[in-house]
Amino acid sequence: LTSIGQVADLFVNNSLALEVQCSGLPISRLQLRTQAYSEAGYQVLWLLGKDLWLKERLTNLHKQFLSFSMNMGFHLWELDDEKKELRLRYLIHEDLRGKVHCLTKVFPFGEGNLLDILRLPFAKQALSHLTCPLDRDLPRYIAQQLYYKSPNWLALQAESYSRGENLLTKTAEEWYPHIRLPRSAIGFAQIQKDLTLVYQDFDQYYGNIEDKQKQVLYPPIIYRKPM
């Protein structure tokens, strides 16, 4: 693509650029590369190499590779050259400890239509869900984080004090839902959709749940209020 000074690893149907990203890069660089594709009329999909595979935590860089669909929520793609497979990590959520919860679909190389596979998050499909037990040890974890002066938890405690509350007195049930949608203070480079209503629907859905002994994670389409 001489017009934007970039070389895609693969083009699909002359409108979708596939980029294999094997190592970390500055978020600002990723944002610029994504924007350049968009302005040239191309959609770009990032396939993450081994060093960037999703592990226990969602880094700030990972968040800039996230895509979003109502049927599969936040998701990203991993390329595994050793196992000869493409992996879709979807329904990506974070708990209050910062740990990732998600589901995975595996696509062996050479099986199926590549474009159909890449379109799967946006295709009509049977919807998946993920069930997680209540984190009963969360209050102790939060007390520990405050003791060691974790900046994030100290900031939340300051907010809590301003409302006349104290994080240390909250029970595990009062923290429900423990597992939440990813958030990014700088937005998401790959997502143009305004997610305000998605977050609102999520909060309202779990605010109405009476059984707080478990949390069932659904695709965002499930949280949408009936018209």
Model-derived regions: residue spans:
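Nucleic-acid nuclease catalytic cores
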Residues: 40-76
